[in-house]
Amino acid sequence: MPKSNDRINLTNQFLIAMPNMADPTFSGTVVYLCDHSERGALGLVINRPTDIDLQALFNRIDLKLEIEPLLHVPVYFGGPVQTERGFVLHDASENTYTSSMQVPGGLEMTTSKDVLEAVASGKGPERFLLTLGHAGWGAGQLEDEISKNGWLTVEADPKIVFDVPAENRFEAALALLGISSSMLSGDAGHA
């Protein structure tokens, strides 16, 4: 584990689950890290669509969505923490939303309903991914999982988040490292 003065910052990175991932919740996932600090980390799983679409979710929260192309956009499982709460990962915009976190790389993560109201009215971000829940790690927990070969890390590419079909995001994230899933092994060691 790095010393505190050697701390790495994994904000704006993809975490790619290795085959030996101990937690089945994260098996086969790609997580976009929105925040990573000495206090812990927060990320969103980007490749697990649920059976809920925007229309169903918006109906649940009393928002009228009339933009035809968005009706059947899936809502994603963002992680096992706060699964009843929505998290919207989107391109940074000139609009200011009540509760947004800017992420290096030109993205924002917003948790306030005003971003959903903007989407419903056609004035929201053009590219977005809506999740229910998020992934969270306490201080040192993610670093420990990485040191035990639970995750690969690579700088995130927003095109993978927004433009690649969900079922191809795992392989697309691995391709950023120049590898494919057929090259991964559950066995690992340290030199």
Swiss-Prot record:
It holds the Pfam family DUF179. It comes from the Bacteria. InterPro entries: AlgH-like. One of its GO terms (cellular component) is cytosol. Belongs to the UPF0301 (AlgH) family. This is UPF0301 protein Bphy_2327. It comes from Paraburkholderia phymatum (strain DSM 17167 / CIP 108236 / LMG 21445 / STM815) (Burkholderia phymatum). The lineage of its organism: Bacteria, Pseudomonadati, Pseudomonadota, Betaproteobacteria, Burkholderiales.
